[in-house]
């Protein structure tokens, strides 16, 4: 974390109920809230969906309630919360020749999928802190390219020479390099121009383009597509989020004047495997 932030306290805890962690809030200049169980940790059932919801919506409610117990002068000035680009509706079916080329900015309405409702409710709990005089930022994040995480799962088929596009390959995928994501979070802590929802992405590319670029970065072919039916058989409902997408664009970051270190997909992938 850059030295200009001063003292940084990292807290790893269960946010389902108040506890000793609340002491770290008093006098903090900002809170960066990244809690949430991995969406792709396991196949979804009713219990897993509840875990995903509790680890985001309920945890954020508990956090804001803890902030409310502080004296106004001791409250954080900013709450920077994670959110997801899945906030937006699915694009039309991939058979549509255009597959929804319309750019999606932060002003777009939420969707009605499970993750869209989850992100909507998650953000609503964070935005409740505004009533306490706290500036709230919700980072609607796409795929983050960096060591581990989503990229590690994406590269495995390519390493085995069986990588390729998913489904039609026409679905849009918003992406950002991990270093740029961190820089945006750091800026949001102190820069008051960051407020409300922020599309945390560099741009969006077609899934087929992402697969081709990933194969190039790994020195592997990208010739074997993954059929939609096979993905649905393996992942169930979660597959819909890989087979559909929206052309999410970072309108607010552009307006603020954010500068990306890795503006091109090829460059971002080349610096994502260290």
What do these predicted ranges mean?
Residues 2-59:
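NAD(P)H-binding glycine-rich loop region in Rossmannoid oxidoreductase-like domains
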Residues 54, 58, 93-138:
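Catalytic helix-loop patch of NAD(P)-dependent Rossmann-fold dehydrogenases
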Residues 110-115, 140-148, 168-176, 189:
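Glycine-rich "substrate-gating" loop/helix at the edge of Rossmann-like oxidoreductase active sites
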Residues 120, 132-134, 145-153, 188-198:
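Glycine/proline-rich active-site loop of Rossmann-fold NAD(P)-dependent oxidoreductases
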Residues 127, 155-164, 170-205, 274:
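Alpha-helical substrate-binding/gating segment
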Residues 191-237, 270-274:
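Mid/C-terminal beta-alpha module of Rossmann-like enzyme folds, strongest
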Residues 240-274:
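C-terminal amphipathic/interface module of NAD(P)-dependent oxidoreductases
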